[in-house]
């Protein structure tokens, strides 16, 4: 019965009916309500800056938002890449923006650059994981949650004029499925316009040939489709950053002063800074936020939930409930636990057998060694006994010879002492 009701409700939901209203209801104010709620809540926008030390990341951020962010000066002697986030509260008119700028400090400064991308990937995944954990809470509060997911990665390319470095290709390839990448050529005033044009073509060709997916400004919205299509053709943007003001004619402009002339930051004939600012902030900021949530975060979330045992149902079957998923995961866990216990028990038994064999082998070796030492001891004892007997025999022979010699000496002494007495007797006669 329950299954029939569920099918009936499902069919009803699949076939909505169109009705006409007899008068004004009021839900046409929903867009205004949404705008009012969004303005009250405020917005968050998180930018990841990746590029070599000294390439102008901090200067460009100051120029983009027309302010001065307090940042520590980075050293060229970092032992590893570390991510340094800084959060600022900005306000323009009545719109609040919580801006987080994450700098990849030390990127490209190490001799071994094979794993330079790893801390960046780990940081992006960590922000996804934090958001996922907040979503999975029983009592979650996403309204007040400070979303730290990276919305855009500005990848600063060194203006060599030749081609992309292998480090750039590897890093962007590792990041393109996790974040919206906008490649920019930094310090574009250091190479000529002709070299810059060739460099842009070379960069885009290398990105395409290596399968690197960069962020494309959306063309499905009629309001911005035309300008976005034009701007897509200008990628990568060649930018110049500066917070210094230089007098050009009768007005002050942000520019870089050189002995040979002035490079105006906001002059589109000099660089693409205005194009970058328009595309990044004025036109596509919300799309970058949406792409981060609906594409990159959803990919991470799907992979994580599949690892946890969740999965979508087939078209012909009923969706899996949380209880079914839990029970299936519990059975899988218990089965895995039993298998591990059996493996450990078998390993323990094998280890005991191996130990017993080793002990028996040691015992046999010790017994053989003991028997060998015993034989050696007996042999030595026999030799000592023979030596003792020989010594006793020699001692006895020596004593006999000594006694014989003493007897002979005594007889000789006695005979010698009798001769004077005989002479005295003869004289008396």
UniProtKB/Swiss-Prot annotation:
Region annotation G4 motif: where it falls in the sequence: 186-189
Subcellular location: Cytoplasm; Cytoplasm, Cytoskeleton; Synapse; Cell projection, Axon
Binding partners and assembly: Septins polymerize into heterooligomeric protein complexes that form filaments, and can associate with cellular membranes, actin filaments and microtubules. GTPase activity is required for filament formation. Interacts with CDK14, SEPTIN4, SEPTIN5 and SEPTIN7. Interacts with VAMP2; the interaction inhibits interaction of VAMP2 with SYP. Interacts with STX1A.
Similarity comment: Belongs to the TRAFAC class TrmE-Era-EngA-EngB-Septin-like GTPase superfamily. Septin GTPase family.
InterPro entries in alphabetical order: G_SEPTIN_dom, P-loop_NTPase, Septin
Function text: Filament-forming cytoskeletal GTPase. May play a role in platelet secretion. Seems to participate in the process of SNARE complex formation in synaptic vesicles.
The encoding gene: SEPTIN8
Region (G1 motif): 51-58
Coiled-coil ranges per UniProt: 322-408
Bias kind Basic and acidic residues: ranges: 376-391
GO molecular function: GTP binding
Binding site for GTP: 51-58, 106, 187-195, 241, 256
Record key words, sorted: Acetylation, Cell projection, Coiled coil, Cytoplasm, Cytoplasmic vesicle, Cytoskeleton, GTP-binding, Membrane, Nucleotide-binding, Phosphoprotein, Synapse
GO annotation, cellular component aspect: axon; cytoskeleton; presynapse; synaptic vesicle membrane
BP GO annotations: regulation of intracellular protein transport; regulation of protein stability; regulation of SNARE complex assembly
Residues covered by region (Disordered): 376-397, 409-429
Residue spans of biased composition, Polar residues class: 409-420
Residues covered by the Septin-type G domain: 41-307
This protein's name: Septin-8
Sequence positions bearing N-acetylalanine: 2
Modified residues (Phosphoserine): 10
Span list, region G3 motif: 103-106
């Amino acid at each position: 019965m329950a299954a029939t009701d569920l099918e009936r409700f499902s069919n009803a939901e699949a076939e909505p009916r169109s009705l006409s209203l007899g008068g004004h209801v009021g839900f046409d104010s929903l867009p205004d309500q949404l705008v009012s709620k969004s303005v009250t809540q405020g917005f968050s926008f998180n930018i990841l800056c990746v590029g070599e030390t000294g390439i102008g990341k901090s200067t460009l951020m100051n120029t983009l938002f027309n302010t001065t962010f307090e940042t520590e000066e980075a050293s060229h002697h970092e032992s590893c890449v570390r991510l340094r986030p800084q959060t600022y509260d900005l306000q323009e008119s009545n719109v609040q923006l919580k801006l987080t700028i994450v700098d990849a400090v030390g990127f490209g400064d190490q001799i071994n650059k094979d794993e330079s991308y790893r801390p960046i990937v780990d940081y992006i995944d960590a922000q996804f994981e934090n958001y996922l954990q907040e979503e999975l809470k029983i009592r979650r509060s996403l309204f007040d949650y400070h979303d730290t997911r990276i919305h855009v990665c500005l990848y600063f390319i060194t203006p060599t004029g030749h081609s992309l470095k292998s480090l750039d290709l590897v890093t962007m390839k590792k990041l393109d499925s996790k974040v919206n990448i906008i490649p920019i050529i930094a310090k574009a005033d250091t190479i000529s316009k002709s070299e810059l044009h060739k460099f842009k073509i070379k960069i885009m060709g290398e990105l395409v040939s290596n399968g690197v997916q960069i962020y494309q400004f959306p063309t499905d919205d009629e309001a911005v489709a035309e300008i976005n299509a034009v701007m897509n053709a200008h990628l990568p943007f060649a930018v110049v950053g500066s917070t210094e003001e230089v007098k050009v004619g009768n007005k002050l402009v942000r520019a870089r002063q050189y002995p040979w002339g002035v490079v105006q930051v906001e002059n589109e004939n000099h660089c693409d800074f205005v194009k970058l600012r328009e595309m990044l902030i004025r036109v596509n900021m919300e799309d970058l936020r949406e792409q981060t949530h609906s594409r990159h975060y959803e990919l991470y979330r799907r992979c994580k939930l599949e690892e946890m045992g969740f999965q979508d149902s087939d078209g012909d079957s009923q969706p899996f409930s949380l209880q079914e998923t839990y029970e299936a995961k519990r059975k899988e866990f218990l089965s895995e636990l039993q298998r591990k216990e059996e493996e450990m028990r078998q390993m323990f038994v094998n280890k005991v057998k191996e130990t017993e064999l080793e002990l028996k082998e040691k015992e046999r070796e010790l017994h053989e060694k003991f028997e060998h030492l015993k034989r050696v001891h007996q042999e030595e004892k026999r030799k000592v006994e023979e030596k003792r007997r020989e010594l006793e025999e020699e001692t006895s022979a020596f004593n006999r010879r000594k006694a014989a010699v003493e007897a002979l000496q005594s007889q000789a002494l006695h005979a010698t002492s009798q001769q004077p007495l005989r002479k005295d007797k003869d004289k008396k006669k």
